[in-house]
Regions:
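Mobile active-site "lid"/loop adjacent to the S-adenosyl-L-methionine
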Residues: 31-33, 70-95
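Class I S-adenosyl-L-methionine
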Residues: 129-130, 134-176
């Protein structure tokens, strides 16, 4: 079983369903995101594998795998679309970490997909992130890193080039400590 917290378009839930899982719950608290996720999941023919639920973060159930790709930058969103980019005071990230252990089955894992762009922009430190993980009763079981391949990572005329060229997106494998 798996949960996709903050599913947005439903893409992570769909990838999980396509790869190997058949019992997936995808949650979001934004009505437009829920509508989009339901539309995409139905169009992909995955409606029997994925259940889309309205929730602030977690469903009531536990799972073997809980994934989350929260907004990457601490900041105040000024429009609904910006809620996918900015996470005021890192609220969603902190709440995901704080609630993760309670929503994992024994031996389960949480997968946090997060860019370190905020670190390169001095908006958050790695030490803060690791502190939040530890405070939540979690430990890092592993991490997979990927360098971005989008054009802005290589555009030295971009105002954020110094940060973007160092950016790494990571899949943090988290387990109960």
């Amino acid at each position: 079983s798996a949960v996709d917290v903050g599913t947005g378009t439903g893409v992570l839930a769909a990838v999980l369903a396509q790869r190997w899982l058949s019992n997936i719950v995808a949650t979001d608290n934004d009505p437009r995101a829920l509508e989009c996720a339901r539309f995409n999941i139905q169009n992909l023919g995955m409606g029997k594998q994925i259940k889309v639920l309205e929730a602030d973060l977690f469903p009531e159930s536990k799972a073997d795998l809980v994934v989350c790709n929260p907004p990457w930058l601490p900041g105040k969103p000024t429009s609904p679309i910006e809620r996918a980019i900015y996470d005021e005071n890192s609220g969603m990230l902190k709440a995901f970490l704080a609630g993760l252990a309670a929503h994992l089955n024994a031996g389960g894992e949480g997968w946090l997909i997060l860019s370190d762009l905020a670190e390169h922009l001095n908006l958050r430190t790695r030490e803060e992130l690791l502190g939040w993980i530890e405070a939540a009763g979690l430990k890092v079981a592993g991490r997979l890193d990927a360098k971005p391949k989008h054009g802005k990572a290589f555009d030295n005329t971009d105002g954020l080039f110094d940060a973007r060229c160092k950016e790494m997106t990571s899949l943090w494998r988290l387990v109960a400590a």
